[in-house]
């Protein structure tokens, strides 16, 4: 066996041994590990973090939703138009923004973070009944979705639940956090519909329900990310660089930072947690149907340097885990001789296959370009 084959065999053996424990990265930390195992170690070029010069300090836009869904319909036309302009500008230039005054109660935000942490920190045997990579199940728990396909594993564990359009029952979810997950998902569905309305108007579409009518807000997947303290945070990542498959992602950050967005394809910009705020980013599917007007940008999470775990609750408006033959392409109303289609039409299932098989550090959208 040549050296390359030997390395590959050794790596597969490491991955299988790790998977068989069903305790994830937290299990490694609990065992008292002092060094990051080879399967997690990233090369320096991947870990590099180019920051903008001091004269060019950036922060992602923050948008005040003036109370969220409950108050939006009663906003005066000037306030509403201002919100649409701000969200459209952020979607075109950043692909990322934060929303405040969004209408979701602060106690709900705190309880869902506490629930996700409680799930990951409960007795390992209780978690193991959810450990699976079978995404036909309503709820699964694992470490690294792409454990066996990525070049390197990342320093995090994940729980994942399908909350819409076919919501789980209380029996499908963990007792320690199921109730708050369902409550939070309902709040996020309402907020997501509002954001899709604003984005529809920002695109200049006559119907503010246009994106909702395309089922962009129909499916919701809730993730509970747990980033344990890392003994060597300069040797690995919490989540490697990527774009999201989704139409839209709404992220609740915990108290610890770590999320970074690649701005202008050159500078890594930190997105520190803001109490009560939610981070919103656009996914590949929204870039596709907006014909590139709105952008899906790369982002990552650096390894956790703190002594306590980092919690994150991203919710994806996406059908990626549920096969769909619905066709999506650039919205016809946006096209003209001056703005011809940049992408060909595709089905969700075809695009999901492209996303899963794309080369490292590339976008699946490249394979749809005309």
UniProtKB/Swiss-Prot annotation:
Entry binding sites for 2-oxoglutarate: 310
Pfam families the UniProt entry points to:
2OG-FeII_Oxy, DIOX_N
State any single GO MF term.
Answer: 1-aminocyclopropane-1-carboxylate oxidase activity
Q: Quote the EC number.
A: 1.14.-.-
- Coiled-coil parts of chain: none
Q: Which UniProt keywords apply?
A: Iron, Metal-binding, Oxidoreductase
Listed under GO biological process in this entry are:
biosynthetic process
**Cofactor comment:** Binds 1 Fe(2+) ion per subunit.
UniProt cross-references to InterPro entries, sorted A to Z? DIOX_N (IPR026992), IPNS-like_FE2OG_OXY (IPR044861), IPNS-like_sf (IPR027443), Oxoglu/Fe-dep_dioxygenase_dom (IPR005123)
The UniProt record lists the Fe2OG dioxygenase domain at 218-320
Intrachain S-S bonds: none
Per the record's keyword annotation, is Lipid metabolism included, yes or no? no
Q: Which PANTHER family match?
A: 1-AMINOCYCLOPROPANE-1-CARBOXYLATE OXIDASE HOMOLOG 8 (PTHR10209:SF705), OXIDOREDUCTASE, 2OG-FE II OXYGENASE FAMILY PROTEIN (PTHR10209)
Q: What is this protein called?
A: 1-aminocyclopropane-1-carboxylate oxidase homolog 8
Q: What is the lineage of its organism?
A: Eukaryota, Viridiplantae, Streptophyta, Embryophyta, Tracheophyta
């Amino acid at each position: 066996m040549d050296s390359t084959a030997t390395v590959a065999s050794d790596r597969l053996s490491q991955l299988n041994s790790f998977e068989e424990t069903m305790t994830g990265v937290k299990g490694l930390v609990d065992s008292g590990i002092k060094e990051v195992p080879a399967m997690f170690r990233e090369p320096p070029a991947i870990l590099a973090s180019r920051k903008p010069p001091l004269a060019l300090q950036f922060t992602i836009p923050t948008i005040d939703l003036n109370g969220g869904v409950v108050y939006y319909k009663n906003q005066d036309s000037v306030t509403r138009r201002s919100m649409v302009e701000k969200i459209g500008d952020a979607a075109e230039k950043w692909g990322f923004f934060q929303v405040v005054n969004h209408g979701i109660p602060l106690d709900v935000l705190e309880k869902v973070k506490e629930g996700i942490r409680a799930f990951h920190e409960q007795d390992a045997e209780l978690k193991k009944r959810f450990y699976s990579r079978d995404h036909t199940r309503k709820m699964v728990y694992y470490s690294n979705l792409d454990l066996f396909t990525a070049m390197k594993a990342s320093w995090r564990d994940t729980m994942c639940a399908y909350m819409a359009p076919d919501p789980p029952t209380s029996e499908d979810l963990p007792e320690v956090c199921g109730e708050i997950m369902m409550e939070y998902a309902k709040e996020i569905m309402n907020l997501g519909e509002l954001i899709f309305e604003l984005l529809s108007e920002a695109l200049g579409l006559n119907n503010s329900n246009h994106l909702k009518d395309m089922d962009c807000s129909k499916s919701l997947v809730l993730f509970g990310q747990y980033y344990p303290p890392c003994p060597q945070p300069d040797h690995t990542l919490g989540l490697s660089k990527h774009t999201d498959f989704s139409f839209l992602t709404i992220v609740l950050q915990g108290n610890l930072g770590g999320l970074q967005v690649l701005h202008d394809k050159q500078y890594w910009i930190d997105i520190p947690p803001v109490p009560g705020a939610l981070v919103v980013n656009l996914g590949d599917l929204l870039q596709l149907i907006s014909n590139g007007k709105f952008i899906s940008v790369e982002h990552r999470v650096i390894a956790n340097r703190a002594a306590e775990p980092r919690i994150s609750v991203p919710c994806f408006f996406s059908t990626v885990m549920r096969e769909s033959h619905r066709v999506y392409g650039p919205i016809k109303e946006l096209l003209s001789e001056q703005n011809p289609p940049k992408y060909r039409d595709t089905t969700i299932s075809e695009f999901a296959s492209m996303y899963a098989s794309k080369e490292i550090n590339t976008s699946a959208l490249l394979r749809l370009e005309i």
